[in-house]
Swiss-Prot record:
Motif (EXKPK motif): 150-154
GO biological process, one term: inositol phosphate biosynthetic process
Native organism: Cryptococcus neoformans var. neoformans serotype D (strain JEC21 / ATCC MYA-565)
Alphabetized Gene3D superfamilies for the sequence: Inositol-pentakisphosphate 2-kinase, N-lobe
InterPro entries the UniProt entry points to: Ins_P5_2-kin, IP5_2-K_N_lobe
Coiled-coil region: none
Protein family per UniProt: Belongs to the IPK1 type 2 family.
Keywords on record: ATP-binding, Kinase, Nucleotide-binding, Transferase
Domain of life according to the entry: Eukaryota
Name this polypeptide is given: Inositol-pentakisphosphate 2-kinase
Length: 414
């Protein structure tokens, strides 16, 4: 549960002094961070999660300090210009004592996925920063059970045909969602039960189809798919938990109630339309057209040569976001943004294409024995909003080309 957050100043509390590493349970991790949920008895940390950065030998202390400043500026000042604070979680930056930090990471190593264990170097220098976040899976309501769904919706739009290169890609990329292309490329399915275009459509029936498809993918994958996660009473559950009757609510009744909660919450929220606009407006000409602009400016260099794409600074990022919010559709005009601005915009669009929605509500056991949603308890937050390295654009372009070409080779023009 990363930090799409409303930032709070770095003052007390101090997890290293106030808690034991064993008070924190592993939740999940991404490429650069691990997230923990507080399981101890302190009211100060109740309903809190802790996100820590993995130590890496490849990051120099000075570069890490600059990166910390950039990420801090992004959380505190820049991100809230793009997403309203009611969609962001609150957060507080904390400094962790080195021995406590290392003990925390060593303690959870046994439960971490094997594919995530490489790249951590406990000898790496640098400060040990963490971010205290809202634990959106937990509940302080007596007598009510917190239920939550985490959705990673992915790309909610199709690119404009006039900007697609080469011509062979047009019939594919303008009709087949990026999610379907990627699923087919990975060997999963060319017709998955879930399509983001349905979820982002705003049409109730299509949105219901999307949610049913996400349930299906979750069940088929035995809960391993990262597009749909289910939490009950602060714990992530699996399809086995549901099928084996390990929940306080019956399986069929639970699925029905949570699907309706999710659908109603998303329909009354502006989260999906806003994310779609950010995805599309920050990626207005498709990466294939952006690659053509790069090649025109640097004809003797590889596409998106990382040596020609310096890291973005906090000042530069803030400046571009101000340009963007002054005219969000400006990128559709080829004479508006510079190449550098378009690359920054694309890196920002990648954040909103890969973020997650967290829908939460509370169920209470009524006197008639039926579990009912507590009125007004539903909410939606946007999480997993970390900045992505701007140099990743070379990898993104390569992936884009691979997925549509594989579809063409295996399925034809559409």
């Amino acid at each position: 549960m990363n930090d799409g957050n409303h930032y709070r100043p770095a003052i007390s509390p101090n997890p290293s002094a106030d808690t034991q590493p064993s008070d924190w349970a592993y939740i999940a991790e991404g490429g650069a961070h691990i997230v923990f949920s507080y399981q101890g008895r302190s009211k100060t940390y109740a309903t809190r999660a802790l996100r820590v950065r993995k130590p890496s030998a490849t990051t120099e202390p000075l570069a890490q300090a600059e990166e910390n400043d950039l990420f801090g500026q992004w959380r505190r000042n820049i991100l809230p210009k793009l997403l309203p604070r009611q969609l962001l979680t609150t957060s507080r930056e904390v400094i962790l004592e080195d021995r406590w930090y290392k003990e925390l990471l060593a303690m959870v190593d046994v439960v971490r996925p094997d594919q995530r264990k490489s790249g951590i170097d406990f000898a790496a220098k640098g400060d040990r920063r963490g971010v205290l976040l809202e634990d959106l899976t937990s509940s302080e309501d007596d007598g009510a059970i917190a239920v939550a769904i985490e959705i990673k919706p992915k790309w909610g739009f199709l690119p404009c045909t006039e900007h697609l290169h080469p011509p062979e890609s047009v019939s594919i990329k303008s009709h087949v969602s990026r999610f379907r292309l990627h699923q087919h490329f990975r060997g999963c399915s060319d017709d998955p039960p879930y399509d983001p275009l349905d979820l982002f459509s705003g049409d109730k029936m299509r949105m219901r189809t999307a949610l049913d498809g996400l349930w299906t993918m979750w069940e088929i994958s035995r809960g391993k798919v990262n597009n749909w996660k289910v939490f009950v009473g602060g714990k992530e559950i699996s399809p086995d938990d549901l099928q084996n009757g390990l929940l306080p609510i019956g399986g069929d009744d639970f699925v029905t109630k949570i699907t309706q909660l999710t659908l109603d919450t998303l329909q009354t929220s502006f989260a999906l339309p806003l994310l779609k606009n950010l995805q599309q407006n920050l990626d207005p000409i498709d990466i294939s057209s952006l690659a053509a602009l790069f090649q025109a400016e640097y004809p003797n260099s590889p596409p998106f040569d990382p040596d020609l794409i310096p890291d973005v600074s906090a000042v530069e990022l803030n400046g571009f976001v101000d340009i963007y919010i002054s005219d969000p559709q400006a990128g559709q005009r080829m004479d508006s943004w510079s190449l550098r601005e378009r690359i920054i915009a694309y890196a920002l669009s990648a954040i909103f294409k890969d973020c997650s929605l967290f829908i939460r509500g509370f169920l209470k056991h009524a006197e008639d024995g039926v579990w009912r949603l507590v009125s007004g308890s539903d909410s939606v937050k946007v999480i997993d909003l970390d900045l992505k390295p701007i140099k990743n654009i070379q990898k993104w372009a390569e992936t884009d080309e691979k997925v549509w070409k594989y579809w063409l080779e295996t399925k034809g023009a559409r």
